């Protein structure tokens, strides 16, 4: 830089220009100026690590790995959630009560209120002829007693007066004196296990009437009055 140029500059500009010239001489001495130019024009090549990572990501998108499962479930068959409409047989398995109802109605026929009342009237007449020494009551049969559930509730006042205050085995005697043991549940005032066997074995149907006569502390003699269907024929076993 000549002295004439420095005379036309301020002190700050002159000092800055001298610093720039000094830096240029240092870069030329170390050959850094040509190296920086070569770097500027060199083509950019992608990093091999970035390429590898991109390939891994793309492969994961195309072929996803199976979901992780615990060791306890690893050997179990895969659960499929496809909804398939059940066929008729499967629907029958899921709703056995409807099938039982259909069979029952087909074999029983329809029962009118008059037939129910007539069976109950005959049962009351029979009860009036029994030995009053042994307490008794009339129990008309309902659908829940002989088809669904097979739970037979007994009159509460009778249970509180004559039956045990705790659960017990109550024996039922039919007209042939055959014995059937049932489970008496004191807190529910009714017969559970064993009653179904008695009802099915004797062909009890909705609308029939029964007379329970307590001949021993935990033994009933059971008399059965059959109801009649609408065609006037009495239903038998």
Curated annotation (Swiss-Prot):
GO terms for molecular function: DNA binding. InterPro entries: B3_DNA-bd, DNA-bd_pseudobarrel_sf, REM16-like. Residues 137-228 bind DNA. PROSITE patterns: B3 (PS50863). The keyword Transcription applies. It comes from the Eukaryota. Keywords: DNA-binding, Nucleus, Transcription, Transcription regulation. It is found in: Nucleus. The keyword Cytoplasm does not apply. CDD domains: B3_DNA. GO terms for cellular component: nucleus. PANTHER family: B3 DOMAIN-CONTAINING PROTEIN OS03G0184500, B3 DOMAIN-CONTAINING PROTEIN OS11G0197600-RELATED. This is B3 domain-containing protein Os03g0184500. It comes from Oryza sativa subsp. japonica.
